[in-house]
């Protein structure tokens, strides 16, 4: 397992050219070369990870192997015993016979990525909800309404491509908001790091 502080020490801008071996992150780690892999700066995963770990979107060391192709990242981590990388859960799930997921300790003990831990909010701060926004004028079109209804009533389908489905209660609330024509977002244009699905539902209930 690793702590959030250790991830920050490894990935923060100040680590570039300075933190190059595992034991520099934690003396208990081996004195081996640190090999890092991650998405490029145009990736939403990059933005969220740097916001969650380093406190500012796009704030990251630059001396790591970056790629917009998650399969390239998977191959890089898989082929190097001293490598660590971050990418979407879907790519870990598709290759979990070759990769090891690192449990993250955010102060309450190590927690591994899983549907249960993401849903109950314990896998923080490295889990996030994904959103679909519909233009008000488009929401009046029958085919758009049918698509949104299908998406929200068949949420379990996302599991087939490695994503984690929302609880049915969250889907029901989103569908009610859509039917009622409620506009806007509870985030005010800024990312919310570490928010749980339960907290998100409470906020959206106030829209």
Where does each model-flagged region fall?
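Flexible loop/hinge segments at secondary-structure junctions
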Residues: 1-207
């Amino acid at each position: 397992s690793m702590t959030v502080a250790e991830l920050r020490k490894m990935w923060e801008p100040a680590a570039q050219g300075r933190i190059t071996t595992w034991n520099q992150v934690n003396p208990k780690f081996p004195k081996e070369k640190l090999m890092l892999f991650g998405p490029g700066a145009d990736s939403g995963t990059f933005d969220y990870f740097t916001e969650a770990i380093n406190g500012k979107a796009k704030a990251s060391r630059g001396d790591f192997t970056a790629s917009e192709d998650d399969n390239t990242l998977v191959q890089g981590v898989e082929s190097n015993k001293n490598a660590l990388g971050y990418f979407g859960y879907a790519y870990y799930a598709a290759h979990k016979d070759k990769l090891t997921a690192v449990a993250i300790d955010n102060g309450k003990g190590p927690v591994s990525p899983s549907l249960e831990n993401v849903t109950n909010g314990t896998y923080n701060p490295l889990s996030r909800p994904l959103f679909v926004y519909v233009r008000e004028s488009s929401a009046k079109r029958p085919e758009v309404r049918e698509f949104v209804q299908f998406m929200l009533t068949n949420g379990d389908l996302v599991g087939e491509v490695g994503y984690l489905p929302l609880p049915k209660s969250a889907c029901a609330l989103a569908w009610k908001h859509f039917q009622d024509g409620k506009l806007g977002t509870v985030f005010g244009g800024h990312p919310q790091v570490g928010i749980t699905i339960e907290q998100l539902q409470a906020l959206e209930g106030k829209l």
